[in-house]
Amino acid sequence: MQEQYRPEEIESKVQLHWDENRTFEVTEDESKEKYYCLSMLPYPSGRLHMGHVRNYTIGDVIARYQRMLGKNVLQPIGWDAFGLPAEGAAVKNNTAPAPWTYDNIAYMKNQLKMLGFGYDWSRELATCTPEYYRWEQKFFTELYKKGLVYKKTSAVNWCPNDQTVLANEQVIDGCCWRCDTKVERKEIPQWFIKITAYADELLNDLDKLDHWPDTVKTMQRNWIGRSEGVEISFDVNDYADKLTVYTTRPDTFMGCTYLAVAAGHPLAQQAAANNPALATFIDECRNTKVAEADMATMEKKGVDTGFKAIHPLTGEEIPVWAANFVLMEYGTGAVMAVPGHDQRDYEFASKYGLNIKPVILAADGSEPDLSEQALTEKGVLFNSGEFSGLDYEAGFNAIADKLAAMGVGERKVNYRLRDWGVSRQRYWGAPIPMVTLEDGTVLPTPEDQLPVILPEDVVMDGITSPIKADPEWAKTTVNGQPALRETDTFDTFMESSWYYARYTCPQYQEGMLDSKAANYWLPVDIYIGGIEHAIMHLLYFRFFHKLMRDAGMVNSDEPAKQLLCQGMVLADAFYYVGENGERNWVSPVDAIVERDEKGRIVKAKDAAGHELVYTGMSKMSKSKNNGIDPQVMVERYGADTVRLFMMFASPADMTLEWQESGVEGANRFLKRVWKLVYEHTTKGEVAALNVAALSEDQKALRRDIHKTIAKVTDDIGRRQTFNTAIAAIMELMNKLAKAPQEDEQDRALMQEALLAVVRMLNPFTPHASFTLWRELNGEGDIDNAPWPVADESAMVEDSTLVVVQVNGKVRGKITVAVDATEEQVRERAGQEHLVAKYLDGKTVRKVIYVPGKLLNLVVG
């Protein structure tokens, strides 16, 4: 065994061993308990970042631990390979998205191997290959035949100069990111999947997810947004159709003083024909990109349409306004306004001088003061005719019943959730498998024409999708008739919604899933990824699982039993102010810092001498140039050190502050472990451990060893507090470093301890553990070794410390057998010289004994 710990030598050797022996490849085995450990698959951006390293290290620690428990562990990896960044990079580098993507995959695969992750590489998949997306296309056509897919027009961001659709992130301050042209809103036909058909189940089944973070479940509940209310129809003077609104507060209906419709509503369009101000307003709204998140903060604007609606209960005429806070995509595109009891309605009414009518009493029973804001709390109705005096629930029901009896109201359950728009007007995605015949008939692509392959050898101009620019690509024949293929591609959330299931049977050619394999491995036992995916990916992931279940492919209701959301990785951020006042961000690697006695940064400069402003710790990002390259760290310290620091520096679900001093500390610890094993093994053969012959000190050390095993097992397996597990191993190592090595039993005990330590470290530092296990002559390879089991008998305390008091004052502490009698404890106390001098010549008048803890002798 070499004396020095040299990770650069051992890590590549161990990785080669894993590759050659296919150590982590698994197949279904009904005789073993399965464990499916999955980290969210990466986008092949070109290089791994520390967020990846943290996510995948957590997964690998769990997978290796479960493997050591004797389970059949599946830990696969793949590539979420479609998406917009590849198009931008292709234009920038004068290439096509495919070669750029495949080059990145090859590079990042080597980086993952360099970090020692125990993946089953035989199951690797890339979502941009026809072998993968063909099954997604086939499934989409089946959903279409079931009535779960439809096409309708929907608003997109349109650049009139480039004649192309822009993603939201390509719209900068209302203008095109490429040519700075003002972006317009344009209605185009798009494909949707009816996720709303599963809204109730997606909501209710959250209650089955006991091991998902409450924050994620709350976010999904709010996103689905189930509400109970009443849909109400209004007659409108001089307008052919009724206006329908939905409200969750029918108790306030007598305070409805106006209606508001979206700018795109047919009523507003009709009114605009004779109203230039309204026509201008509609144009403004059409060209304003409004995310739902912005609605609460933006200025509320509107124009009176001139139409008057009839309040169904009072018969009063109320104005109908077009307003920018109503969206056609939500509900009916019309809302009823109760400015006395809704703050948004109040602000709008105040701005435009509309009637504000209070109909709910304040909590103290007085009329509400509406001089500055609306009263939004529920309460007793007043100013509401026959409904006055009713509380919220009674008022809700009475008004709902009355409207229903009149035929103008209907109780409804509504959802905030909207159907999933899966059309993207981009090139680098899976083609949507639909065709249009010459007579306008839309059909799914026949199965014998699947997959619809995306051509990879293309020229990118940065404006138009190559498959939209090439009229020949779209031409096809269906049932002997000429047809045109759909040139939109799938939203890339499609691919990431079912990849976890395809990992169970990546080579299967008979269909999307091999149900036997899928049902052996699924559901995923633990899924690891960032909380930023809470409502998009994780909702589609759950939805797709239910679709596959209803297609008979899987027999479980949910895709993953446990969800672990890892925290962000933070690093120091520095900048200096340039000549033009701009901020130039400097990498923390290049910052020369001075610290105070508490280790806080007080001064910093870079190599060029710029005085740096320190902005504190913030999320590693390109914009602040504070990312740390994992590859540089691995080359400097070794993969095991980086992994150990990642798991020790913070609980897995909390933010992690990157400190190179902490990495150095992890490296020093591994060197200490290596040194102790080296010193132990160079002393030659080790005798068998004779537990019965151990001295008190040896028993105490063995007790510490097995208590550590018990704690680390609980910390990793149940609590998933990996940092405290490592801390416990470090504490034990400190004791082992001081332990005597004088006789055979000392060395036998050290052998037992080191075999346990190396196995407990294996999930965290697999290369060093693999090597040290062999040096310690462990049985077989550590990858197949069982997790150490705590010996209960070793942890039993056979002695205990008793505090001895004389007249209530502590005079000594004695060690006695756990089962010692009171007489034996008194006798032992009398032999303790510190106690004996206080008893000399005195009579013991009373004895107070708390077994195993305290002996108080009252003397006089």
From Swiss-Prot:
User: What reaction(s) does this enzyme catalyze?
Assistant: tRNA(Leu) + L-leucine + ATP = L-leucyl-tRNA(Leu) + AMP + diphosphate
PANTHER family attached to this UniProt entry: LEUCINE--TRNA LIGASE, MITOCHONDRIAL, LEUCYL-TRNA SYNTHETASE
Q: Motif 'HIGH' region located where?
A: 42-52
Could you say which protein family the record assigns here? Belongs to the class-I aminoacyl-tRNA synthetase family.
This chain's protein is named Leucine--tRNA ligase
Q: What is its EC number?
A: 6.1.1.4
Q: Which residues bind ATP?
A: K622
GO BP terms in the entry: leucyl-tRNA aminoacylation
Compartments in which it is found: Cytoplasm
* Keyword Transcription regulation part of the UniProt annotation: no
Which HAMAP family is this protein grouped with? Leu_tRNA_synth_B
Molecular function (GO) terms for this protein are:
aminoacyl-tRNA deacylase activity; ATP binding; leucine-tRNA ligase activity
Statement: the UniProt record of this protein carries the keyword Oxidoreductase: no
Q: In terms of domain of life, where is this protein from?
A: Bacteria
Chief location bin: cytoplasm
Q: Name one GO cellular component term.
A: cytosol
Which UniProt keywords are given for this protein, alphabetically ordered?
A: Aminoacyl-tRNA synthetase, ATP-binding, Cytoplasm, Ligase, Nucleotide-binding, Protein biosynthesis
Q: Which gene encodes it?
A: leuS
Pfam families, per the entry = Anticodon_1, tRNA-synt_1, tRNA-synt_1_2, tRNA-synt_1g
Segments carrying motif 'KMSKS' region: 619-623
What general EC class does the enzyme of this chain belong to?
ligase
